[in-house]
Amino acid sequence: MNQTWRTHLQSKLQQLHEREQYRNLHVTEQAEETWLIRDEKRMLNLASNNYLGLAGDERLKEAAIACTRKYGTGATASRLVVGNYSLYEEVERSICDWKGTEKALVVNSGYTANIGVISSLVSRHDIVFSDKLNHASIVDGIILSGAEHKRYGHNDLDHLEKLLKTASPEKRKLIVTDTVFSMDGDTAYLRELVELKEKYGAILIVDEAHASGIYGIGGAGLSHIEDLAQKIDIHMGTFSKALGCYGAYLTGDAIYIEYLHNMMRSFIFTTALPPGTLGAVQKAIEIVQEDHKRRENLIANGEYFRSKLRDAGFNIGNSSTHIVPIVVGSNENALRFSKRLQEAGIAAIAIRPPTVPINSSRIRFAVTSQHTIADLKWAIDRIIHIAKEEELFV
């Protein structure tokens, strides 16, 4: 290996160790279950995105197997070549019916959706206004686009309006936000964002990754709770979280989607999703609309878990969903807390910069519809006990 490169990479890795930001891969089995196996130890799973417990659902498995047997294991090409199976059009029609939109585009992941949609729609001549706590894929899409990037304080609508008011009237404007923020568990003020985008002639993109399948009518997303869906220009959502599958979608007015499938590089220059994945996705979309009980259980479990941790004195920020952080400050605190929790049989992972701002390292808990109150109480008792021993109330 080239010695200059070796020295450079070793130096960068050493810096990560010194900042306690080095990350390891841990062998995990049965992550689709309420109890998983991590490093050969059985733990209560409070770390996954399998919010409705569908990743292990037999109906999804059977749908995936049936489509794999019929169409094979791979798409064989990009969608614009010969990879556009009829399954794609079926899934996209289902998304439009579910979301009440004109047209949809299925893509390979939430990350490729966000970097693709933003970098396709705007360029160095435009401005993007982005919440400070938006997902990294949104930030990367803005960087890739070359557009002017204006970050407003988290959920700070006054700051956003000030930025919109002072922006050049010559430039096209795009506002983008998560609906449920993945590391904080709070939600965007969608009604006010719609008002601002209309007032200042912007378009609005929302990332429903952690809301799709859970909130709104039939689990269509947070934007459907307040009947705002038709006023939002483009919705992005994933199949990899509440729907228990893989992939993502973009949906909105037909002209947006037509433009994206012609211009979005992360869609054009990649092989399509496997047919088995699409079969599972189609079944998952059907299930989440019909199975109200799973969604109700998830929301109730989130309320229970949040209230108990808040009452115990933990800093859980403004979480109002199934994602519940305990903010502990330093990287060292988060790593120590995570280690003790895993030793006690709780799969809970330390989240550190650059994923979250400096000095806001945390344990990110994610409850699911499949957890019982007994599971959560068992975990809460251990969380409180360990935090007291380690003096980790912040």
Curated annotation (Swiss-Prot):
E.C. designation(s): 2.3.1.47
GO BP terms in the entry: biotin biosynthetic process
Residues annotated as signal peptide: none
GO molecular function annotations of the record: 8-amino-7-oxononanoate synthase activity; pyridoxal phosphate binding
PROSITE patterns (UniProt xref): AA_TRANSFER_CLASS_2
Source species, domain of life: Bacteria
Catalyzed reaction equations: 6-carboxyhexanoyl-[ACP] + L-alanine + H(+) = (8S)-8-amino-7-oxononanoate + holo-[ACP] + CO2
Modified residues (N6-(pyridoxal phosphate)lysine): 241
Pfam families per UniProt: Aminotran_1_2
Residues given in the record as substrate binding sites: 23, 135, 355
Annotated coiled-coil segments of the chain: none
Residues the entry annotates as binding pyridoxal 5'-phosphate: 110-111, 182, 207-210, 238-241
Pathway: Cofactor biosynthesis; biotin biosynthesis
Key words, A-Z: Biotin biosynthesis, Pyridoxal phosphate, Transferase
Cofactors demanded by this protein: pyridoxal 5'-phosphate
Quaternary structure annotation from Swiss-Prot or TrEMBL: Homodimer.
General function of this protein: Catalyzes the decarboxylative condensation of pimeloyl-[acyl-carrier protein] and L-alanine to produce 8-amino-7-oxononanoate (AON), [acyl-carrier protein], and carbon dioxide.
Family that this chain belongs to: Belongs to the class-II pyridoxal-phosphate-dependent aminotransferase family. BioF subfamily.
Name this polypeptide is given: Putative 8-amino-7-oxononanoate synthase
Origin species: Bacillus cereus (strain AH187)
